[in-house]
Amino acid sequence: MTMQDKEPSAPACRVIVITSGKGGVGKTTATANLGMCIARLGYRVALIDADIGLRNLDLLLGLENRVVYTAMEVIEGQCRLEQALIRDKRWKNLSMLAMSKNRQRYNMTRKNMMMIVDSIKERGYQYILIDCPAGIDAGFVNAIAPADEAILVTTPEITAIRDADRVAGLLEANDFYNVRLVANRVRPEMIQQNDMMSVDDVQGMIGVPLLGAIPEDKNVIISTNRGEPLVCQKTITLAGVAFEEAARRLVGLPSPSDSAPSRGWFAAIRRLWS
């Protein structure tokens, strides 16, 4: 049995919204890479691109040419959910659902969003990650409606941190008690020169537990242009290892960097946290 055939048991489907408030901080990149990592650990994962009319998740996964039907067509009765869920060819236990086609605007309601997620749950998926639209308008409210947990993505920049802190407050107001932080595009050399806030500083300002710290890495741009998640590249990268570490923490598995020696990849990841 291969790893992609093996499916660890999970007590219930976990629905996690990945949000940021501010656009351009790497939220969709985090969704694609965390989702791929969880699938590679053997779980059944569905990724939902909830950005109506401005989807990008399919590009990062290399699935843009396979989007024929979307969630809106499922809701309107034009196709079945199985037709809209696109199964990844690399890992069969990973699927993606686009909410709409680009340049199409629909009125996605909370009720419709809940219905779609409930239907995916019924098909045996163990993790559903929702890529939330940027901003805090109706798209945000609808995207968080079916979720039980949230991952807040930010960068160590004061504008992004302020927006992330605002979103953290909105999540708390909507009864989210399991919220974790991903600090993205961390640059250790700038932190050492006091030109960038440390990950500990970012976490302290926002006040939610830290799930992972992802270093700035040019390979993220390369992988995006190739339509392949960074964690699928043959070359090991520090950012890729950091995403894998965050995914292991998310599913409750031991993290190698937590007990890493003073040298090596995992030690480098651990140093990002401080």
UniProtKB/Swiss-Prot annotation:
Leader sequence range is none
Q: Where does this protein come from, organism-wise?
A: Nephroselmis olivacea
* Gene name of this polypeptide: minD-A
Note whether Transit peptide occurs among the keywords.
Answer: no
Give the record's keywords alphabetically: ATP-binding, Cell cycle, Cell division, Chloroplast, Nucleotide-binding, Plastid, Septation
Q: Which InterPro entries match?
A: CobQ/CobB/MinD/ParA_Nub-bd_dom (IPR002586), MinD (IPR010223), MinD_FleN (IPR025501), P-loop_NTPase (IPR027417), ParA/MinD_ATPase (IPR050625)
GO BP term, example: cell division
Compartments, as annotated in UniProt: Plastid, Chloroplast
Q: Name the major location.
A: plastid
Task: Recall the GO molecular function terms of this protein's record.
Answer: ATP binding; ATP hydrolysis activity
Concerning its family, UniProt says: Belongs to the ParA family. MinD subfamily.
Write out the function statement from the record. ATPase required for the correct placement of the division site.
- PANTHER family in the record: SEPTUM SITE-DETERMINING PROTEIN MIND HOMOLOG, CHLOROPLASTIC, SEPTUM SITE-DETERMINING PROTEIN MIND HOMOLOG, CHLOROPLASTIC-RELATED
* Pfam assignment, any one: CbiA
User: NCBIfam families annotated for this entry?
Assistant: minD_bact
Cellular component, GO annotation: chloroplast; cytoplasmic side of plasma membrane; cytosol
User: Protein name, please?
Assistant: Putative septum site-determining protein MinD
Positions with a binding annotation for ATP: 22-29
